[in-house]
Amino acid sequence: MDKETAKQRAEELRRTINKYSYEYYTLDEPSVPDAEYDRLMQELIAIEEEHPDLRTPDSPTQRVGGAVLEAFQKVTHGTPMLSLGNAFNADDLRDFDRRVRQSVGDDVAYNVELKIDGLAVSLRYEDGYFVRGATRGDGTTGEDITENLKTIRNIPLKMNRELSIEVRGEAYMPKRSFEALNEERIKNEEEPFANPRNAAAGSLRQLDPKIAAKRNLDIFVYSIAELDEMGVETQSQGLDFLDELGFKTNQERKKCGSIEEVITLIDELQAKRADLPYEIDGIVIKVDSLDQQEELGFTAKSPRWAIAYKFPAEEVVTKLLDIELNVGRTGVITPTAILEPVKVAGTTVSRASLHNEDLIKEKDIRILDKVVVKKAGDIIPEVVNVLVDQRTGEEKEFSMPTECPECGSELVRIEGEVALRCINPECPAQIREGLIHFVSRNAMNIDGLGERVITQLFEENLVRNVADLYKLTKERVIQLERMGEKSTENLISSIQKSKENSLERLLFGLGIRFIGSKAAKTLAMHFESLENLKKASKEELLAVDEIGEKMADAVITYFHKEEMLELLNELQELGVNTLYKGPKKVKAEDSDSYFAGKTIVLTGKLEELSRNEAKAQIEALGGKLTGSVSKNTDLVIAGEAAGSKLTKAQELNIEVWNEEQLMGELKK
């Protein structure tokens, strides 16, 4: 056929196949036999092979990528993908409800959704086309897994409308697909996956999309990052809107008028759990009103308007074979139970934390005891209690050693603490664990430097402190086991790139006691340079918001150690950045901006920058952002499709700006 006829036929085939895919994979209501679908697909493949320039990004033939990737690229999410706070019982839910109503009043409705046990992903669409998909990662930065996500038939390559949005969802492996996959792996003498979630995550992190395509993954989408710009007013309307756009949402959802109705519904949904064709690990409860969501806002880690109810952990009985001791980066000795492998909440468990010596004594835990194990929050395995009546006499009492199992130094118990510690700064285990912490995601975030590689570098005596990482050469690293030319080059490149990190990552990576990632950022933002922080007095540290006495003492102690100062000087000489690179926090009284000290509401869609960027810049100039319009609001900035907030501002005679006025003030 000629080129024009081929073009028209290809367009017709794409429309038809995408329609049939939607009916089959999303609606579960196929209107044609599989053979007819396959015939049309083969016809389209033939046309595109003959005329490659007719192949479009939304073609169903593009779902299975060809090339194997060398590595996943990093992706910064337009809006952070935060985790949810957890509730473990009805009282936790009532506490959540009480906090919500204290902030927004008693007129609250909740949208209740299943918590799918899979992998959280974001899907970026530009003008209606799927252009990028990513894992959640640390919530701010994920990995680009676009080609693998294209293999999931329920993800439309082209939406029903030409929108530029970021959709959030949970990719998962159906139970039937999981069972079939494990049967095949066992047949091929491969290790079976522990649970569907691990299988889904492992499939989406394959560098070869053809492997992901064989795994029969699925997805439920649950939100749009820019939902408040879509002309909808509630979470439940947002899910209906996603249905209209051609996405697959979970239909086991309901709007509830009270928390007691939510609690009753949870019992009903939990009873269905075993019969669902996919795994769930809880229920998500969200305030339905988007205005109320915005008013409630966020903590550093999670939204205040949503909570995840986690199902009670499964408890099983197994045998405690031994107790192993681990030395952490701060010298704490942690006993770990070695168990006869057993399935708990869908995952095979062979180890469980025993926390400390006091807990072992309190529960009278002995080696070879029969113990009850559960997963706390369905994540961390722990020993609940001992079945004393099943003891046979072969059990052995356990006592903590007096010397470090790694270096032989005397162990001490610091006053007021339950943990035993090794206080030898030269302890190999502490140094190794400190290195692992330094390169971790929330610290210096050095790709390719995981526990295995760090252990090799340490054992080969190539690295003894964090400064040594920046002295590594390609010639040294390539000698390590399982390190090829390309992986070595990537590792050296990642190490060099980490030199440019902002100060807060370095501070957290140094492992100063009591200084977590949030405190590290607070200190970096306040003092702006490592030099300023080193000189800070205890009084100056205590004057910083959220820095308490223990934190201040720990910082002073750290920077008074000669060996630490030498290490920091060496890092600076090696080119590691010691300045804060993030936005500066400006007090209202120190700003001459029009925004200083004003209460401001942003509404509608902005063209020149995202809402998060606008918020950050306004706050940097001393403005205070809130989610709802009231008589206390000083200014409303209205973008396109501003909606009810603009109307309310006009009714209350509140000053209203458009985007042009906003940009003018920001550019001053």
From Swiss-Prot:
Needed co-factor(s): Mg(2+); Mn(2+)
Which residues does NAD(+) bind? 34-38, 83-84, 113, 136, 170, 286, 310
Residues the record lists as binding Zn(2+): 404, 407, 422, 427
Molecular function as annotated in GO: DNA binding; DNA ligase (NAD+) activity; metal ion binding
EC class, as a word, reads ligase
- SMART domains listed in its UniProt record: BRCT, HhH1, LIGANc
**Which reaction does this enzyme catalyse, per its entry?**
NAD(+) + (deoxyribonucleotide)n-3'-hydroxyl + 5'-phospho-(deoxyribonucleotide)m = (deoxyribonucleotide)n+m + AMP + beta-nicotinamide D-nucleotide
Cystine bridges: none
Set out the biological process GO terms recorded for this chain's protein. DNA repair; DNA replication
Write down what this protein is called. DNA ligase
Q: Which UniProt keywords apply?
A: DNA damage, DNA repair, DNA replication, Ligase, Magnesium, Manganese, Metal-binding, NAD, Zinc
Q: What is its EC number?
A: 6.5.1.2
Q: Sorted alphabetically, which Pfam families does this protein's record hold?
A: BRCT, DNA_ligase_aden, DNA_ligase_OB, DNA_ligase_ZBD, HHH_2, HHH_5, Nlig-Ia
- Protein family (similarity comment): Belongs to the NAD-dependent DNA ligase family. LigA subfamily.
Q: Where is the active site?
A: 115 (n6-amp-lysine intermediate)
Query: Domain BRCT: where?
Result: 590-668
For this protein, the record's Gene3D superfamilies field holds: 5' to 3' exonuclease, C-terminal subdomain, 6.20.10.30, BRCT domain, DNA ligase/mRNA capping enzyme, Helix hairpin bin, Nucleic acid-binding proteins
